[in-house]
């Protein structure tokens, strides 16, 4: 209890200090825009399988009352946005979980020079329950890019997360910290000719001993070169070292590919590709030979569709069986605007690695993910959406031999009968199926209805549609 009170006290002091700074700047600079807006939100949530179990499912109703504040500070090359949302949650069946929770977020956009852009975000919650069904996450992130010369750019980022969530491998809930740092440099030496180097470092540390904890670093390089206006090549090489906290079976992986590109139009290329992967570990080496054919369709600045088909030839130096498997390559994101009122967003990806991010200890992993979301403006103040997604994870090593399938379907309505009043209704259905004994199948239905009172539009910018925001909504 003492730590919780200390955390709440720290949040109040931190928030008050930031607000004082915001208002101080607003008087100091005539061009500064500062805004403080209170909001009131009442939410009712129903879940027919709160603990996501196969048997003995638990229904739960949760009523939330939130009084939040948002503040914006805009001045020349600096934009800051602060959100503070205290909330009281009332559980119908799990009475011991009733209580207040506090959420604080701080977003910043900085342009320290003409050639440098930096974005930062902090998100903190006082929620610290460590019980099944509860999830929370505290994050801090910074992303930046600097243009060194007319043709050379440097990108850099750091992401930190401390969370309590459900583990893919076992279905149990665990607390862990994730640190991820990346840096990359790219040089463009022709209209479509590029080359670059990247490096990433990642640490996933569990509070209690866990087989999925790891440390990883990954240098890589790439080049794309068009020999003629219609014929080109691209290639990439990478090294990946994964060091497990609870195992001596660490993995070193060397990968590389080369593609022949044939341009059919300004936005459409076909390709022939060969990729090779070689992994070393104490339990046995692994070779993957992967020829494929496909196409790249650049549909816009931030959207593209890349599809291919090939065969994975796997050779193992252990008890795992060699295999020849058909594999569909997929990397797609596109928004189709079919009318002034409606749009369809699609996303999809596939891949394979010797140790995945979400269940590293399960070893060699193949995955497919695809989803879509349909948005439609039914009336001026009434909008709707429908979404669906499918995820498949395969862990084919002989001592694991596991396949997980997740189907998610849902939709929602948003109605603003008055400028200061918003009503939202959403529904989501999740079906999880697995062939492992480590965790059970489950289905879950969740309904959320909320009423929000907001006196005016905040200066907080409306987030632009992005692939990451779409996938966060339809996959999670």
Give the residues covered by each predicted segment.
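Bacterial N-terminal signal peptides
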Residues: 14-25
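Generic short amphipathic/hydrophobic targeting helices enriched at N-termini
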Residues: 8-9, 16
């Amino acid at each position: 209890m003492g730590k919780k009170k200390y955390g709440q006290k720290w949040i109040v002091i931190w928030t008050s200090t930031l607000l004082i700074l915001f208002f101080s700047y607003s008087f100091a600079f005539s061009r500064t825009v500062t805004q403080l807006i209170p909001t009131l939100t009442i939410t009712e949530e129903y879940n027919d399988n709160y603990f996501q179990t196969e048997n003995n499912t638990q229904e739960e109703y949760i009523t939330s009352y939130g009084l939040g504040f948002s503040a914006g500070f805009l001045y020349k090359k600096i934009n800051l946005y602060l959100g503070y949302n205290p909330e009281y949650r009332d559980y119908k069946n799990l009475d011991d979980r009733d209580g207040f929770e506090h959420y604080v977020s701080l977003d910043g956009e900085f342009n320290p020079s003409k050639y440098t852009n930096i974005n930062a975000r902090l998100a903190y919650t006082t929620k610290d329950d460590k019980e099944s069904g509860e999830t929370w996450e505290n994050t801090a992130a910074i992303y930046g890019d600097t243009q060194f010369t007319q043709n050379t750019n440097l990108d850099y980022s750091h992401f930190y997360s401390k969370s309590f969530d459900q583990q893919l491998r076992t279905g149990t809930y665990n607390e862990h910290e994730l640190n991820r740092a990346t840096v990359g440099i790219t040089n463009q030496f022709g209209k479509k000719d590029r080359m670059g180097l990247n490096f990433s470092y990642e640490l996933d540390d569990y509070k209690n001993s866990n087989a999925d904890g790891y440390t990883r670093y990954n240098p890589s390089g790439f080049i794309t070169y068009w020999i003629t206006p219609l014929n080109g090549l691209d290639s990439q090489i990478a090294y990946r070292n994964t060091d497990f906290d609870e195992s001596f079976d660490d993995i070193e992986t060397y990968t590389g590919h080369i593609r022949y590109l044939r341009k059919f139009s300004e936005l459409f290329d076909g390709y022939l590709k060969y990729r090779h992967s070689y992994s070393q570990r104490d339990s046995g080496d692994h070779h993957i030979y992967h020829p494929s054919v496909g196409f790249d369709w650049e549909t816009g600045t931030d959207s593209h569709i890349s599809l291919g088909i090939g065969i994975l030839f796997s050779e193992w130096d252990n008890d795992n069986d060699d295999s020849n498997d058909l594999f569909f390559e997929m990397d797609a994101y596109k928004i189709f605007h079919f009318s002034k009122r409606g749009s369809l967003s699609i996303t999809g990806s596939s891949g394979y690695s010797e140790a995945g991010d979400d269940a590293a200890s399960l070893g060699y992993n193949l995955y497919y993910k695809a989803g879509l979301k349909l948005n439609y403006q039914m009336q001026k103040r009434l909008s709707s959406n429908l979404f669906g997604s499918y995820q498949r994870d395969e862990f084919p090593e002989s001592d694991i031999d596991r396949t997980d399938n997740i189907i998610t379907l849902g939709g929602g309505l948003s109605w603003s009968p008055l400028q200061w009043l918003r009503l939202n209704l959403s529904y989501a259905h999740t079906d999880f199926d697995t062939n492992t004994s480590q965790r059970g199948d489950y289905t879950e239905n969740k309904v959320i209805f909320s009423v929000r009172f907001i006196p005016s539009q905040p200066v907080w910018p409306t987030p632009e549609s992005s692939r990451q925001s779409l996938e966060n909504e339809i996959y999670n």
